């Protein structure tokens, strides 16, 4: 670990296949910190976590993927190689609706804190389901290990 006054820098290594899962975990962590005061930010960042999770899934299988932000388009790509549950499909569609309504004007949406909590739960569920695939789980485990190490180090640095 490398510290500079006012900032935390850690030298960590993470594989390319775990990288997007690591970023998705960071998004979920930020959403968990902000849902009560900034539910629109928390809900939107959960769409980012779902996007990174699905792209990470496809990356782990050495598949090319759409570089856009439409979750339902990514879902189609994931479904071409994996049987996604109906529940998870509805969660992805739910989050995709947040993404559109928060990105563009004149779309009806003003997420409540409860909506943000639901978005967090659904983003976590998507990662859990896709991470249950034995070809994917080692990379999610790696991402969780690095994420937790950084959170612990940050807490030690700034909470003591």
Would you name each region that the model predicts?
Residues 1-160:
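Terminal alpha-helical segments
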């Amino acid at each position: 670990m490398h510290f500079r006054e006012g900032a935390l820098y850690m030298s960590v290594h993470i594989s390319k296949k775990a990288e997007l899962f690591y970023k998705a975990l960071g998004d979920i962590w930020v959403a968990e910190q902000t849902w009560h005061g900034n539910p629109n930010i928390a809900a939107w960042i959960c769409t980012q976590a779902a996007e990174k999770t699905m792209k990470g899934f496809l990356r782990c299988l050495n598949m090319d993927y759409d570089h856009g932000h439409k979750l339902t388009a990514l879902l189609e790509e994931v479904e071409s190689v994996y049987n996604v549950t109906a529940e998870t499909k509805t969660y992805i569609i739910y989050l995709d609706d947040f993404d559109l309504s928060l990105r563009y004007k004149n779309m009806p949406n003003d997420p409540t804190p409860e909506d943000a909590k639901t978005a967090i739960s659904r983003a976590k569920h998507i990662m859990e389901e896709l991470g249950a695939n034995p070809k994917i789980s080692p990379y999610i485990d790696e991402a969780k290990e690095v994420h937790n190490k950084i959170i612990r180090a940050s807490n030690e640095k700034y909470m003591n």
